[in-house]
Amino acid sequence: MELVFLGTGAGVPSRGRNVTSIALSMLNERKTIWLFDCGEATQHQIMRSQIKLSKLEKIFITHMHGDHIFGLPGLLSSRSFQGGDSTITIYGPAGIAEYVETSLRLSGTRLTYKIIFNEIEPGLIFEDKMFSVIADDLEHGVRSFGYRIVEKDKQGALNAEKLKAEGIEAGPIFQKLKNGEVVELEDGRVVDGKNYIGEPQKGKIISIFGDTKETASELELALNADILVHEATFEGDKGKMAGEYMHSTTLQAANLAKKANVKKLILTHISSRYDRDASKALLIEAKSVFENTEIAYDLAVFEVGE
């Protein structure tokens, strides 16, 4: 899995940063892309990346502020023009369905695919055999969600060396054993596949937050995550201002990462007051509290579990 930061700015686009959108590329895991927020010009950013709209499966909106949703109608329309035909599910706060449907209706846009809207409440909002997604409220003046994406543990690897050491050669039988089946060999031996499968591989956890001030629900959403994506609209000494504007600072994000025992913190939603040089200072500030911190720039790609 990879996180592709399509927009990393706060509020309005700047020369260096577009407004918020993050793609979670799951091509190896499920051959799809999930999108988190869709600020204005997200589709332009996608054209500059390796992301394909045809692979888009789900869109998760954190909150209804314009810098997180104004790119949706255009992106959905372009996907249709490009021949996209698979269903997309959009998750988000109450109002997301009305916003999208009204924009498409008033612009006379007819899509070639179905959209399913899921206006969410805190709790488990999606689960299949591979992943689950949990949402919870943050604190931002308007309703704002954080998302916790949990990859389910994968089956352990088949111990081929152990099998060969016992005179069992590779072939179709290996797949049956990998599936945990009990197999009778030509020589009469009965082999239980479960005895040749290693420990399960722990699935990854990614926590992606919308805009928020410091709030208690953050800890559980972030706990033990492989990657925490957190806004850092302000530098560390502007905690009072951040609270008044319902945003967070670099140090608040870093302290949460440390407390939640995450493996990596990625800062995004950077105010336009901070140019590239000033952004480097933000990173140094956060690293003073939580060393494994990165600051995202537009089109940056991060491997999950790297």
UniProtKB/Swiss-Prot annotation:
The stretch of residues making up the signal peptide is none
Entry superkingdom: Bacteria
Q: Is Thylakoid included in the keywords of this UniProt record?
A: no
Q: What EC identifiers does the entry list?
A: 3.1.26.11
> Record-annotated residues binding Zn(2+) 2?
67-68, 211, 269
> Cross-referenced Pfam families, in alphabetical order?
Lactamase_B_2
> Reaction catalysed?
Endonucleolytic cleavage of RNA, removing extra 3' nucleotides from tRNA precursor, generating 3' termini of tRNAs. A 3'-hydroxy group is left at the tRNA terminus and a 5'-phosphoryl group is left at the trailer molecule
UniProtKB keywords: Endonuclease, Hydrolase, Metal-binding, Nuclease, tRNA processing, Zinc
Give GO terms: molecular function aspect only: 3'-tRNA processing endoribonuclease activity; zinc ion binding
The entry's active site is: 67 (proton acceptor)
Q: Which family does it belong to?
A: Belongs to the RNase Z family.
Q: What is this protein called?
A: Ribonuclease Z
* Gene designation: rnz
